[in-house]
Amino acid sequence: MALRKGGLALALLLLSWVALGPRSLEGADPGTPGEAEGPACPAACVCSYDDDADELSVFCSSRNLTRLPDGVPGGTQALWLDGNNLSSVPPAAFQNLSSLGFLNLQGGQLGSLEPQALLGLENLCHLHLERNQLRSLALGTFAHTPALASLGLSNNRLSRLEDGLFEGLGSLWDLNLGWNSLAVLPDAAFRGLGSLRELVLAGNRLAYLQPALFSGLAELRELDLSRNALRAIKANVFVQLPRLQKLYLDRNLIAAVAPGAFLGLKALRWLDLSHNRVAGLLEDTFPGLLGLRVLRLSHNAIASLRPRTFKDLHFLEELQLGHNRIRQLAERSFEGLGQLEVLTLDHNQLQEVKAGAFLGLTNVAVMNLSGNCLRNLPEQVFRGLGKLHSLHLEGSCLGRIRPHTFTGLSGLRRLFLKDNGLVGIEEQSLWGLAELLELDLTSNQLTHLPHRLFQGLGKLEYLLLSRNRLAELPADALGPLQRAFWLDVSHNRLEALPNSLLAPLGRLRYLSLRNNSLRTFTPQPPGLERLWLEGNPWDCGCPLKALRDFALQNPSAVPRFVQAICEGDDCQPPAYTYNNITCASPPEVVGLDLRDLSEAHFAPC
């Protein structure tokens, strides 16, 4: 985020020059015309002239320069000096470049900047000084650049700012001071920046914010204070930022937020307080934030939610409360959040959710309760959440799913119940989930499935039952799942599959039977595109001839191995997933792959 706007400006500038097809004057000697009429180019640089826009750009990037090149044409509009070994800029070094609008000095060895170094650059709009060794900047450094719109000073060693350093930069929109060593800022640090839209102070050592600091920044839209050492947010600190839309306070040491800390932020849309030490929220923590859309409070130490904490956040769309210490959700814990669409409560210490805890959340689409230890959910606990389409309950110690647990979730599309230690799901537990597309029951302790468990789930496409203890599946168990596309019953204890089990699944394309106790299997349905059979004790007699023929005729559906898809250098050497069909009997073919058996072996069939 720290380099977002500066990087964007760089990219847009480059793209415009490439798209317009400028003429290159690479290697032309100073004072010698290039391949067409145009200005001379310094020997160490490449010059690019845009006829249509009548603009000249000079590229001297990464040339190991220890001093500024001689002979830069006076009409240059953009000068790139990044990635060199410049340790200083002499006074008035650019005084003949009055047309310069873009100057890139980032990635060098600049330890200081002379007050007169930028003399003559009255038309400069974009100045990049990131990734140097700057420790301080003298008053008057930017006195000669009144037209600056963006100034990048991130990733230096600045430990202090002079009062009024930026005074006179009334056109500045974007100021990046991130990733320096600033511990204290003077009251008048940003005096004169009345047009500033984005201010980045992330990655410093700020421990305190005084109300006067942001005085005069009435046009500010985005303020990044993340990754500092702030311990508290006091009242009225941001009261003079009426147009602020995004405020980043994440990854500090904030333990307390004073009542009225965010007063005056009428335009705020995004507030990030994640990765702090906040232990509690008061009823008047968020008053006046009527326009807030996103509130991130994850990775704190919040132990409880007081009633009406969020009462003023009528337009909030995303609330993240994951990785806290919340133990209980009382009735109407989220009162006032009628527009909320995403609610995350994962990895808290939730043991109890009261009936009515989610009342009023009529627009919630995604809810994450995973990583808690709920053990038992009240009947109809999700009543009123008709627009919920994804419910995450992974790793929640549920043990058993009872009827009416999911009553009211008529629009649910995805239900994740992985890793819950489930020993049973009662027959009517999933009834009413007519829109369900994906059901994940992976890594539980299910030993059987009720005959009519999936009744009414006619739209289900993905059913994941791997890593349970299923020894058998009723012949009619999957009958309602006529739209099933993906079925995974791997890592169970299945010894046989009824012949009619898969017959209704005409749309099935992916079937995993890996690591069971199957001895025989008739391939069906006919449209399978991927069939996994590894890890079963196959009896390679006559009943398995049909499977052998299917595997040989459809090698892409029953591959011997598949190379893992990796990004970057994650797979060195390449990783493979094998799909052996290893014979466990009869004795004469033990250890062979079914596909390698000859026709003669099956002649008696």
UniProtKB/Swiss-Prot annotation:
GO terms for cellular component: extracellular exosome; extracellular matrix; extracellular region; extracellular space; insulin-like growth factor ternary complex. It is found in: Secreted, Extracellular space. Residues 536-605 form the LRRCT domain. One of its GO terms (biological process) is cell adhesion. LRR repeats lie at residues 75-96, 99-120, 123-144, 147-168, 171-192, 195-216, 219-240, 243-264, 267-288, 291-312, 315-336, 339-360, 363-384, 387-408, 411-432, 435-456, 459-480, 483-504, 507-528. Residues 32-74 form the LRRNT domain. Plasma. Disulfide bonds join 41-47, 45-60, 540-583, 542-605, 566-571. Keywords: Cell adhesion, Disease variant, Disulfide bond, Glycoprotein, Leucine-rich repeat, Repeat, Secreted, Signal. The keyword Glycoprotein applies. The keyword Cytoplasm does not apply. Involved in protein-protein interactions that result in protein complexes, receptor-ligand binding or cell adhesion. It is linked to Acid-labile subunit deficiency: A disorder characterized by severely reduced serum IGF-I and IGFBP-3 concentrations and mild growth retardation. Pubertal delay in boys and insulin insensitivity are common findings. This is Insulin-like growth factor-binding protein complex acid labile subunit. The gene is IGFALS.
